[in-house]
Amino acid sequence: MSAQAELSREENVYMAKLAEQAERYEEMVEFMEKVAKTVDSEELTVEERNLLSVAYKNVIGARRASWRIISSIEQKEESRGNEDRVTLIKDYRGKIETELTKICDGILKLLESHLVPSSTAPESKVFYLKMKGDYYRYLAEFKTGAERKDAAENTMVAYKAAQDIALAELPPTHPIRLGLALNFSVFYYEILNSPDRACNLAKQAFDEAISELDTLSEESYKDSTLIMQLLRDNLTLWTSDISEDTAEEIREAPKRDSSEGQ
């Protein structure tokens, strides 16, 4: 569709909404990337920012789910000693990992070149730095060796930069600050294998938000309380020291991003 290149910013946003309704998330990503690349000197609107986030979360989410399922089957076949099947599964897993890498590289490049440099408001800075941390974390989920180490280090740098701004500039009940705490704590638990630090971060974020619950604005009440519930769910899970299946039940910021309505 050569006509797509000629669409205005507003038309690309509309097409992205259309693609979302049709659950055609790859195309939704394409439309929102065009919007993001046209705004070098100004920020995306909150609506545009959320559309971009939702598009990428759905595209990456489908592959992350596929990877987990295939990895689980691979472990079962390995334990049964089915080497031929394991070889087939490894190749198939590699295909999914190639897709995951391409998706993460795409959004990380966009964040580096356009979105982070053009952000001026504390809220959008935290949003994009959190997003940067999220996609490096997704790389760390399946990469190995030096690549995993690099992805984990980049995750930490991005989340830490986001946290510094969030703690200084956003209230404890702000959905973006809460969503950051949620995903940062998941990073500590899943990638760094630091359950104590994960629990401390999640508990502090939850407690600080609870103490200021009466200051919550009506429009962000639903988003904030949802993320607080997810923080509490993870704390319950992590502190009860459950079986190996724990990781699959861990909650992250929801697909409709933690900043919606802000």
UniProtKB/Swiss-Prot annotation:
Keywords: Cytoplasm, Nucleus
SUPFAM superfamilies: 14-3-3 protein
Tissue/organ expression: Expressed in seedlings and roots.
An annotated GO BP: protein localization
InterPro entries named among the record's database cross-references: 14-3-3 (IPR000308), 14-3-3_CS (IPR023409), 14-3-3_dom_sf (IPR036815), 14-3-3_domain (IPR023410)
Subcellular localization(s) per the UniProt record: Cytoplasm; Nucleus
Superkingdom classification of source: Eukaryota
GO cellular component, one term: nucleus
Up-regulation conditions: By wounding, drought and salt stresses, benzothiadiazole (BTH), ethephon, hydrogen peroxide, abscisic acid (ABA) and incompatible and compatible races of rice blast fungus (M.grisea) and rice bacterial blight (X.oryzae).
PANTHER family: 14-3-3 PROTEIN (PTHR18860)
Protein task: Is associated with a DNA binding complex that binds to the G box, a well-characterized cis-acting DNA regulatory element found in plant genes.
Family per similarity comment: Belongs to the 14-3-3 family.
Protein name as annotated: 14-3-3-like protein GF14-B
Source species taxonomy: Eukaryota, Viridiplantae, Streptophyta, Embryophyta, Tracheophyta
